[in-house]
């Protein structure tokens, strides 16, 4: 068994540039159990980076500080090409750090339980509550409001003010681990929680955190969920090979996607909303045309490709996480073979790889220039994403697919090769 197909020479694959890491304090949190960094997240405006460093602790750090400590600038330009840098263990110890004048503050938050899921949410004041229209609310979220939602192992969800580190809301309805959280990207502060109690719950934070809907349909544990860029569709994935698509205007099930052979643990839409990537314990990342329910691309992590029976068991190549880059052309995945892979949607083999023992999760920065990945020891590692100038054709395709569905593109009076390109059938 190999990590790459026979046609690919591993030595020919580029090594991703490692730029730095965040380390957790050694004491008092030096026990091996409970140190896992189950989740990492970037604020939508790129102002903050957050990660669960184990033992109930979430660390909030201004992303500009991380970049200044590493070897890239805000735009991804290399400033120190020879040596990556690290934020020391001392700099990650508890308490609030007093920032320089004008700099955003850092916070260390004790969430009261092991943090499995985490998400940033920002408000758009003109977006009204979807569930109720009343004049008075306890919380009035302004344009500059930035929230952090944390999902705990006891089923609770806690909402924090990022700028002050204070607890705003405590949401209680799940009966098991909250594995993932995701905010609608339209600024409505609609929050979806995915739990191992087999349920998805929809919360309206503009209505003081009231629960709007429970989405039933998963036969087993729910591991992750993701909104489409226009907030109209939700994808949820879980145990028993489940990949479900939901209409978030009507809160109804659209369809189930079939193709995985094991638990599906991570999902994310492309920036234009045309593609959906799902990661599974069956050693694969599948890229879907979710509007047609068809598979466009399979990114394998074990070769020769395993049989469905072997893929459905303990195959030592479980894919833990997948993330789409902001350029719409690159995908990153973390798997149990101690590698992070950077993929191009135009190729079947990784464009670059990096070593990462015991990786658990990954996320691209808002600009897509940096990938962050959390590990079992609570640390977070950072790499530069392979970058290249996107073609004008790809930029035009992304612009079109933000407003046109696959079915609408297929109805356009254009040549078949162009139609295939616009619907990503040539990836």
Swiss-Prot record:
Listed SMART domains: SOCS, SOCS_box, WD40
WD repeats, residue ranges: 129-170, 173-213, 217-256, 259-298, 314-353
Record-linked Gene3D superfamilies: SOCS box, YVTN repeat-like/Quinoprotein amine dehydrogenase
Gene Ontology BP terms: intracellular signal transduction; protein polyubiquitination
Pathway assigned in UniProt: Protein modification; protein ubiquitination
Keywords, comma-separated and alphabetical: Repeat, Ubl conjugation pathway, WD repeat
Domain SOCS box: 379-427
InterPro entries the UniProt entry points to: G-protein_beta_WD-40_rep, SOCS_box, SOCS_box-like_dom_sf, WD40/YVTN_repeat-like_dom_sf, WD40_repeat_CS, WD40_repeat_dom_sf, WD40_rpt, WSB_SOCS-box_domain
Superkingdom classification of source: Eukaryota
Coiled coil: none
Assembly information from the UniProt record: Component of a probable ECS E3 ubiquitin-protein ligase complex that contains the Elongin BC complex.
Recorded domain comment: The SOCS box domain mediates the interaction with the Elongin BC complex, an adapter module in different E3 ubiquitin ligase complexes.
Function description: Probable substrate-recognition component of a SCF-like ECS (Elongin-Cullin-SOCS-box protein) E3 ubiquitin-protein ligase complex which mediates the ubiquitination and subsequent proteasomal degradation of target proteins.
Protein name stated in the entry: WD repeat and SOCS box-containing protein 1
Organism: Takifugu rubripes
Phylogenetic classification of the source organism: Eukaryota, Metazoa, Chordata, Craniata, Vertebrata
Gene (name only): wsb1
